[in-house]
From Swiss-Prot:
Highest classification ranks of the organism: Eukaryota, Metazoa, Chordata, Craniata, Vertebrata
Function in brief: AMP deaminase plays a critical role in energy metabolism. Catalyzes the deamination of AMP to IMP and plays an important role in the purine nucleotide cycle.
Keywords: Hydrolase, Metal-binding, Methylation, Nucleotide metabolism, Phosphoprotein, Zinc
Keyword Oxidoreductase: no
Protein family membership: Belongs to the metallo-dependent hydrolases superfamily. Adenosine and AMP deaminases family.
Protein name: AMP deaminase 2
Pathway annotation from the record: Purine metabolism; IMP biosynthesis via salvage pathway; IMP from AMP: step 1/1
Ranges of compositional bias, category Basic residues: 10-20
Classification via InterPro entries: A/AMP_deam_AS (IPR006650), AMPD (IPR006329), Metal_Hydrolase (IPR032466)
Quaternary structure and interacting proteins, as annotated: Homotetramer.
Length: 824
């Protein structure tokens, strides 16, 4: 049960050494004005102490220990100051010392190769002097010791089915390119970061890469403490099952009577310090016991953020991760050179399967812009012909028909064209998110947006439901294309969820090809300025209390209960490039005390969304309902610590462009196999030109990336925007058929479609690791490619886990200074 420090009680002890906040003195006075209200306090639902390193190995100490908070605050203060540095402290500048060293190394290698026949003894000595790295001999010795002790479990499990393809094998001693002390420090830090992510994923019942978990289990003193729930077993899918799931016998919104809903648990709900708590009685008082549901400890979260922030600017760790990423890129190029024709031959052997008829999911697309501009134009013209006299809008208390709305604009159906609609992004929207948002208004009129692409209006979202159903019909006709549409909940009023659910149920907006995500725009400052909200906690109550009520007593929100069965999770959206005037730390005001008109920072939104979602997931899992995941927009622009928060809390992210500047985070996202839905055409119009997009680089290194459309209304021209996205990417980056099918398979894996549906699309064994989990008859991805990805990931995980397991190095003294990039 959660314990809260009440009046007169001391606050829970902070797990790291207390230091004065650098922001308190370094940040501008106006950035802190009015935000000095009650600070954040520890709030924990699980009994007992919850230290950060609860299930870590005995020794994961590094040279950064004791300095994480100080280093993180320094980096936060740099981001607030908007430094004019040529490169950020977490990225590599263009003239990187590592690149210079690599060039020198290559020149020396060429010189040595020229002298090999003349002076073999000189060659040997030169190679030993130049390539000498402590990590080689130490790691080799460790391997020999491990074999001598009979510890063969990890190696035996890594034996995969032999696949007929050519592998690149580095013979001899392991070459990491860094001294062993740096290797061990980097390996410990990377492992510690992976443990942190695993902890938060388990806490919220989100997924974590099974391969990574298996390697981390070799290091943990004891298994991670998780809640287990009884689940009804899924009906197994046979190996010969059709690629199309069976059709539903009846519409999922058919029975909406409260009498058919699950029973009432009779539990009470109340939000305390920004998180909904569940009590054993309907009207809880101060002495009413709580239902024990776990959620993240706040002090522990801030400490974990500080650890990761300090990690990404550590010089030796950046060098290690940069080298590993470069190695992964080069290794993939060699793999393609050796096996491209074999992969193509394997694809050609599969009957009735090619890129067009494999499942692909648009994992990042907004419902309000899921149609293309021609589709919207035709729909508006059709509505003007058929429903001219329908009352669609209220202007200053006077009802208006569709005819009157267009007459007030001096427009007829004949006047309308794609150009007058003016919803497509152009060169004027680059780095201008405000102008891009204005493109959501057809003909520049917000009233048309309200009439045609809103769920809550005078006609109860009738037109929007019709156009969404037309898009769904197109997806069903294509058979193999699917989408996860984003619908908005703003948090301005408590009845938003019920209105949205009634819109979906009453208009029967459903398709087996579509799942929903709910996006929460980060617009508290706008609502607070207009006086619509008193504090940030009111916004959180409006977003989450209806969900808890529908879970505890489904009959009280029957439409919402049905609608939530088709919702995958939550998204956090807004312009990331907007400056943040506050840093989320222990001095930040609690949600009920956040009454200023400043917008809370990104991490603040994400933490409270995650904390409430974790509580909700455990409650829903107890009832046998499906759970939600967190899949925010992240890394499109703005500061790097957005990606740090998402690494800890999010199952997948959208965009992730800034990973190209942060080698440590990019390596962590690779090792954890975090899904990244990338939208190159969207980025090309807003933040990054197409040829600079890092998607092909991410794909070659093995990150879990997929292609998505984001906003077809603004960026695409054809009836099939997802195919348009694949087509342009293939032409510009010269992707192979295997690359395209791999992207499509990734999109299905990271999507929120049910396990049974994925079993039909990918094969009943898709959850298994490596080639055993691939069915080329359904995915058209050769086992060669899947085997290469799996073996490479295992080798990278083995490298860092073996280094941590090594006992050759004594404990690093805490007095050793860390190497940081130069400050401003």
């Amino acid at each position: 049960m959660a314990s809260y420090p009440g009046p007169g009680k001391s606050k829970a002890k902070y797990p790291f050494k207390k230091r004065a906040s650098l922001q308190a003195s370094a940040a501008a006075p106006e950035a802190r004005s009015g935000l000095g209200a009650s600070p954040l306090q520890s709030a924990r639902s699980l009994p007992g102490t919850a230290p950060c390193l609860k299930h870590f190995p005995l020794d994961l100490r590094t040279s950064m220990d004791g300095k994480c908070k100080e280093i993180a605050e320094e980096l936060f203060s740099r981001s607030l100051a908007e430094s004019e540095l040529r490169s950020a402290p977490y990225e590599f500048p263009e003239e990187s010392p590592i690149e210079q060293l690599e060039e020198r190394r290559q020149r020396l290698e060429r010189q040595i190769s020229q002298d090999v026949k003349l002076e073999p003894d000189i060659l040997l000595r030169a190679k030993q002097d130049f390539l000498k790295t402590d990590s080689d001999s130490d790691l080799q010795l460790y391997k020999e010791q491990g074999e001598g002790q009979g510890d063969r479990g990890l190696w035996e499990r890594d034996v995969v089915l032999e696949r007929e393809f050519q592998r690149v094998i580095i013979s001899g001693e392991e070459k990491c390119g860094v001294p062993f002390t740096d290797l061990l420090d980097a390996a410990k830090s990377v492992v510690r970061a992976l443990f942190i992510r695993e902890k938060y994923m388990a806490l919220s019942l989100q997924s974590f890469c099974p391969t990574t978990r298996r390697y981390l289990q070799q290091l943990a003193e004891k298994p991670l403490e998780t809640r287990t729930y009884e689940q009804s077993p899924d009906t197994p899918v046979s190996a010969d099952a059709p690629v199309h799931p069976p059709a539903l016998e009846q519409h999922p919104y058919e029975h909406c009577e409260p009498s058919t809903m699950p029973g009432d648990l009779g539990l009470g709900l109340r939000m305390v310090r920004g998180v909904v708590h569940v009590y054993t009685r309907r009207d809880p008082d101060e002495h009413c016991p709580e239902v024990e549901l776990p959620y993240p400890d706040l002090q522990e979260f801030v400490a974990d953020v500080n650890v990761l922030m300090a990690l990404i600017i550590n010089g030796p760790i950046k060098s290690f991760c940069y080298r590993r990423l470069q190695y992964l890129s080069s290794k993939f190029q060699m793999h393609v050179l050796l096996n491209e024709m074999k992969e193509l031959a394997a694809q050609k052997k599969v009957p009735h399967r090619d890129f067009y008829n494999i499942r692909k999911v648009d994992t990042h697309i907004h419902a309000s812009s899921c149609m293309n501009q021609k589709h919207l134009l035709r729909f508006i013209k059709r509505a003007m012909k058929r429903h001219l006299e329908e009352i669609v809008h209220v202007e200053q208390g006077r009802e208006q028909t569709l005819r009157e709305v267009f007459e007030s604009m001096n427009l007829t159906a004949y006047d309308l064209s794609v150009d007058t609609l003016d919803v497509h992004a152009d060169r004027n929207t680059f780095h201008r998110f405000d102008k891009f948002n204005a493109k959501y208004n057809p003909i520049g009129e917000s009233v048309l947006r309200e009439i045609f692409i809103k769920t809550d209006n005078k006609i109860s979202g009738k037109y929007f439901a019709h156009i969404i159903k037309e898009v769904m019909s197109d997806l069903e006709e294509s058979k193999y294309q699917n989408a996860e549409l984003r619908l908005s909940i703003y948090g301005r009023s408590r009845d938003e969820w019920d209105k949205l659910a009634r819109w979906a149920v009453n208009h029967r907006v459903h398709s087996p090809n579509v799942r929903w995500l709910v996006q929460v725009p980060r617009l508290f400052d706008v609502y607070r300025t207009k006086g619509q909200l008193a504090n940030f906690q009111e916004m959180l109550e409006n977003i989450f209390l209806p969900l808890f009520e529908a879970t505890v007593h489904p009959a009280s929100h029957p439409e919402l209960h049905l609608f939530l069965e088709h919702v995958d999770g939550f998204d956090s959206v807004d312009d990331e490039s907007k400056p943040e005037n506050h840093v989320f730390n222990l001095e930040s005001p609690l949600p009920e005390a956040w009454v200023e008109e400043d917008n809370p920072p990104y991490a603040y939104y994400l933490y409270y969304t995650f904390a409430n979602m974790a509580m909700l997931n455990h409650l829903r899992r107890q009832r046998g309902f499906h759970t939600f995941v967190l899949r925010p927009h992240c890394g499109e622009a703005g500061p790097i610590h957005h990606l740090v928060s998402a690494f800890m809390l999010a199952e997948n992210i959208s965009h992730g462009l800034l990973l190209r500047k942060a080698p440590v985070l990019q390596y962590l996202y690779y090792l954890a196999q975090i899904g990244i839905a990338m939208s190159p055409l969207s980025n090309n119009s807003l933040f990054l030109s197409y040829h600079r997009n890092p998607l092909p680089e991410y794909l070659s290194r093995g990150l879990m990336v997929s292609l998505s459309t984001d906003d077809p209304l603004q960026f695409h021209f054809t009836k099939e925007p997802l195919m348009e996205e694949y087509s342009i990417a293939t032409q510009v980056w010269k992707l192979s058929s295997c690359d395209m099918c791999e992207l499509a398979r990734n999109s299905v894996l990271m999507s929120g479609f049910s396990h049974k549906v994925k079993s039909h699309w990918l094969g009943p064994n898709y959850t298994k690791e490596g080639p055993e989990g691939n069915d080329i008859r359904r995915t058209n991805v050769p086992d060669i490619r899947v085997g290469y990805r799996y073996e490479t990931l295992c080798q990278e995980l083995a490298l860092i886990t073996q280094a941590v397991q090594s006992e050759m190095l004594e404990t690093i003294p805490e007095e050793v200074g860390i190497v940081m990039s130069p400050g401003p």
